[in-house]
Amino acid sequence: MKVKKGGGGTGSGAEPVPGASNRSAEPTREPGAEAESGSESEPEPGPGPRLGPLQGKQPIGPEDVLGLQRITGDYLCSPEENIYKIDFVRFKIRDMDSGTVLFEIKKPPVSERLPINRRDLDPNAGRFVRYQFTPAFLRLRQVGATVEFTVGDKPVNNFRMIERHYFRNQLLKSFDFHFGFCIPSSKNTCEHIYDFPPLSEELISEMIRHPYETQSDSFYFVDDRLVMHNKADYSYSGTP
């Protein structure tokens, strides 16, 4: 797949935030996943879900999430709705100017993964990740996010990701990436490019002082129907 640049609108009254979910696709850690660089920690339990305007709506399309003005309080689809068996197995973030790898995580081969007791498994496990970056991350101009993913035995048409970033529930930036068509039973690699304008010193200071109040929703669509929803939050203080 070709290298693609992020697009989409910005929230009013704020600069875009350089926090690529990490997940441009899905930088989640499954049981036994191996982090190679960067820092990721287990999230603390948060408040209960807040029911939003899309809660219970079916199907959910791109235009629905593009209208959201705050982080969602809960997941807008269940893991079972990923009928295409899309599985993100590797994720890497790098500074495009220096080539420095800022974060990388990958799943081990299926044969090396630890057995899982399905009865004890959280149904939302692997859908949330917490990132810890240094303040220098907020001054980067361009970041590349490489994702490697596999698909099941169904063709994936018009695969698209919309990723929306918020600071204190104010929309900062919306990215819109099109993966296109994926053939059945294939492994795919794609690098998305996130362009960041300079941030004001005031905003940088606020984001450093308030870790994990920068959050993102990553929505994945096939044929304009939501099939996956992941979440992330970010600290730029350089400490857990």
UniProtKB/Swiss-Prot annotation:
Annotated effect of mutating residue 37 to A: Up-regulation of KLH18-mediated degradation
Designated gene of the protein: Unc119
InterPro entries, per the entry: Ig_E-set, PDE6D_unc-119_myristoyl-bd, PDED_dom, PDED_dom_sf
Region annotated Disordered, chain positions: 1-62
Comment field on protein domains: Adopts an immunoglobulin-like beta-sandwich fold forming a hydrophobic cavity that captures N-terminally myristoylated target peptides. Phe residues within the hydrophobic beta sandwich are required for myristate binding.
GO molecular function: lipid binding
GO annotation, biological process: endocytosis; lipoprotein transport; mitotic cytokinesis; negative regulation of caveolin-mediated endocytosis; negative regulation of clathrin-dependent endocytosis; visual perception
GO terms for cellular component: centrosome; cytoplasm; intercellular bridge; spindle midzone; spindle pole
Modified residues (Phosphoserine): 37, 39, 41
Keywords, in A-Z order: Cone-rod dystrophy, Cytoplasm, Cytoskeleton, Endocytosis, Lipid-binding, Phosphoprotein, Protein transport, Sensory transduction, Transport, Vision
Protein name: Protein unc-119 homolog A
PTM annotation: Phosphorylation suppresses its interaction with KLHL18 and down-regulates its KLHL18-mediated degradation. Phosphorylated more under light conditions than dark conditions. Dephosphorylated by calcineurin.
Organs and tissues of expression: Localized in photoreceptor synapses in the outer plexiform layer of the retina.
Cell compartment(s), UniProt: Cytoplasm, Cytoskeleton, Microtubule organizing center, Centrosome; Cytoplasm, Cytoskeleton, Spindle; Cytoplasm, Cytoskeleton, Spindle pole
Source domain of life: Eukaryota
Sites where the protein binds tetradecanoate: 131
Quaternary structure annotation from Swiss-Prot or TrEMBL: May interact with GTP-bound ARL1. Interacts with ARL2 and ARL3 (GTP-bound forms); this promotes the release of myristoylated cargo proteins. Found in a complex with ARL3, RP2 and UNC119; RP2 induces hydrolysis of GTP ARL3 in the complex, leading to the release of UNC119. Interacts with NPHP3 (when myristoylated). Interacts with CYS1 (when myristoylated). Interacts with MACIR; interaction only takes place when UNC119 is not liganded with myristoylated proteins. Interacts with CABP4; in the absence of calcium. Interacts with DNM1; leading to a decrease of DNM1 GTPase activity.
Main location: cytoplasm
Pfam family for this entry, one: GMP_PDE_delta
Residue stretches of biased makeup (Gly residues): 1-12
Role of this protein: Involved in synaptic functions in photoreceptor cells, the signal transduction in immune cells as a Src family kinase activator, endosome recycling, the uptake of bacteria and endocytosis, protein trafficking in sensory neurons and as lipid-binding chaperone with specificity for a diverse subset of myristoylated proteins. Specifically binds the myristoyl moiety of a subset of N-terminally myristoylated proteins and is required for their localization. Binds myristoylated GNAT1 and is required for G-protein localization and trafficking in sensory neurons.
Disruption phenotype: Mice develop a slowly progressive retinal degeneration, characterized by mottling in the fundus, mild thinning of the photoreceptor layer, and increase in apoptosis as early as 6 months, dramatic acceleration at approximately 17 months, and virtual obliteration of the photoreceptors by 20 months. Phenotypes are due to defects in protein trafficking, such as Gnat1 mislocalization.
Protein family according to the UniProt entry: Belongs to the PDE6D/unc-119 family.
